[in-house]
Amino acid sequence: MRILLTNDDGIHAEGLSVLERIARTISDDVWVVAPEVDQSGLAHSLTLSEPLRLRPVSERRFALRGTPTDCVIMAVKKILDRKPDLVLSGVNVGANLADDVTYSGTVAGAIEGTLQGIRSIALSQAYQHAVGRDVPWDVAETHAPALIRTLMGVDLPDGTLINLNFPNCAVDAVAGVEVTSQGKLEFGLSIDERTDGRGFPYFWLRFGERAGDFRSGTDIRALRDNRISVTPLKLDMTDHAAQERIAQALREGSVA
């Protein structure tokens, strides 16, 4: 089985090394095409305003001056002589839960793999966001191989990818695996305005206290309870429940 790896934290990220070790427990045909630099938060974006620069790092490992989406496209369309059987994106430093998935370059790597007709899985490792806190990579590294093997045997509908999130706990404290839905997460975003040395303003996005929907069955609740979250995501974002309401409103409004 051929496996393609990518991420959004960059070619030198520790999570990518973890993912390589995970992948090599499953196959000896592992390829890496990852961003040259950190591309976190760029979601499913393409690089269209500048050229893509590809740099071989070592055998079957490449760094691309581009986004995770660019990386998957470059691998499938240029580097590989045939499509991989599996795309793994991650392991991200930090969870990608709830509304995070719309911003996530990690999830986007799996989205692009799915668009290319390849079984794709995004992997993220939760940790305590504080200076000096260690990321418990061993949780993902211990539990991911068996999960991936199981998920490869599931007959998923076309256009479906898997989003895996591993809890912030010790390996032996993991309380199981749960199939979840996306929760709801408020980021507490604000704008931090500062002034440079010439007196001109500049800005940073600032994350405040997060508020989450911890209802049973959500990805947020699973991680809070030290369970591994397995969330199937669909590329088709049509709100089918709203279609008839909108159609009825248009009919009543006599819109042609």
Swiss-Prot record:
Pfam families: SurE. One of its GO terms (cellular component) is cytoplasm. A divalent metal cation binds at residues 8-9, 40, 92. Its EC number is 3.1.3.5. GO terms for molecular function: 3'-nucleotidase activity; 5'-nucleotidase activity; exopolyphosphatase activity; metal ion binding; nucleotide binding. Its main location: cytoplasm. Binds 1 divalent metal cation per subunit. Keywords: Cytoplasm, Hydrolase, Metal-binding, Nucleotide-binding. InterPro entries: SurE, SurE-like_Pase/nucleotidase, SurE-like_sf. It catalyses: a ribonucleoside 5'-phosphate + H2O = a ribonucleoside + phosphate. It is found in: Cytoplasm. Its cofactor is a divalent metal cation. Belongs to the SurE nucleotidase family. Nucleotidase that shows phosphatase activity on nucleoside 5'-monophosphates. This is 5'-nucleotidase SurE. The lineage of its organism: Bacteria, Pseudomonadati, Pseudomonadota, Alphaproteobacteria, Hyphomicrobiales.
